[in-house]
Amino acid sequence: MKIENIRLFTAAGQIDLSLDNGVCRYEDVVVEFDGGKVAITGGQTPLKTLEIEFKNEFFRDALVLCDAFERGYGEFVWKKPDYSRLMPWYFGAYEDNKTYCFGVKTRPNAMCNWRCDAKRITLIVDLRNGRLPLALNGRRLEACQMVSEVYEGDAFDALCAFCKVMCDDAKLLTGPIYGGNDWYCNYGDSSAEKILRHTRRIVECTPKDGPKPYMVIDDGWQVCARCTGPWYTGNQLFGDMGVLAKQIEEMGAIPGIWIRPLRTVEMLPKEWVLTKQDNYAFLMDPSIPEVLDKVAEDITRIRNWGYKLIKHDFTTGDTFGLWGFEMSNDYVSQKEFADKTKTTAEIIKQLYQTIRDAAGDDVAIIGCNTISHLSAGYFEIQRTGDDTSGVEWARTKKYGINTLAFRMPQHNAFYAADADCVGITRQLDWNINRRWLDVLAKSGTPLFISIGDDAYTDEVKADITEAFKLAVSNDVVSRPVDWMENMIPQVWDSAFGRDTYEW
């Protein structure tokens, strides 16, 4: 790739840089390029972004698919290039039986976005601290490593291969990931009794002598409930959370649990608070060491209770004040971080590393509402799309199926890609909803199910039993055959053959 232009944006404005033997200089700033690696050394100059523009010598009339900032919101689609479109992390362009892929390696120290049209391809390296310019004060920042590949043939195969180029150190589980999660049948109206009943149903649908399923306790167990901490005990409907973990294990399942680590109603030192929410809860600032210590303490406590899977949620929304679909170049709406010496990406990675270290190697982690490219290598499982539903089929169709198809290339390259649960309630037509169960069970990706108390019929039980049988017997990812023509693919190839679904 030939670099055409390099633009540095500081608090004072735009500076056009000249490249000399892989190095650009401006006052106290040095930008180095080495084999795709981009490093920046800076002094007191407040830095905002670095734009690296390449001449597009590759495609003219391609279809382009890009990733999302965090989860998908039903927006994944192959479409014509548009330079105004901000493309997080990486993209693929398909033309004349070739796929041209451009991206950065996972876990960069800067937020990275791409733009492209028929003439140019631009990487935007965001060096800011939240929305504020960042002075590196003599520090050398290894911002990112650019990678690009060209593949002949199928675009799905190309993107699967490219995801493995971007991430060569994924933290993966061995064996199938499947079981229960009570959110889409209880929606927080839960209890230990309901969890144990749900566990019993999950276990009785599990293949005889098959691998143990998970049973994940979602929101509603904590003392305050209402999607907020503190996280030091169960409420009166749950009691001792360590006892409950042991009961789940004795029933034949692996205990898992949900937590929102940055939100609490506890009285905190005011310095820890990023912002107040809903007039009663506080969002903690992840740039503060003492906040990270508290997060580690909560994760460690849950691990010590005996939970072998921890699903942590909302850290992107609680830090940035926006959902992924709301984010543009100015993606932070919250107050300023207390620590103004790090990039936003470094602050987020520090939080993820804290959670990883506190959980230890014997506890699996699901990241939900976490940043995909920064999660890879830290977490075994990633919720790749926004919530499906136990009450609204249109939501499952939009978020679940679209996400499953278009983020499938990340599965077992970045992490296990979890497109979310099958919510089984009386409010959804089982004749339609069972198709979502089927495509997910055959996909080779995680399969979690929420079973409503009034929806566990003999027919549903038989369908779940068959789905679990499929899920544990296959680790080959399915393929959305018509994904270039259809945002909600109907034709799927899997290890079990070709299926066409009427959604």
Regions found by a protein language model. Name each.
Residues 1-213, 309:
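Carbohydrate-recognition beta-sandwich/jelly-roll modules
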Residues 419, 451-456, 479-484:
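Short coil/turn segments at secondary-structure boundaries
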Residues 439-475:
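Catalytic cores of secreted or luminal carbohydrate-active enzymes
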Residues 183-185, 220, 427, 452:
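Short strand-loop junctions, especially beta-strand C-caps/beta-turns
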Residues 89, 211-426, 432, 460-461:
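Aromatic- and carboxylate-enriched substrate-binding clefts and catalytic-loop regions
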Residues 1-15, 475-485, 498-503:
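Non-catalytic C-terminal accessory domains or segments of carbohydrate-active enzymes
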Residues 34-37, 440-443, 448, 482-503:
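Carbohydrate-binding surface patches
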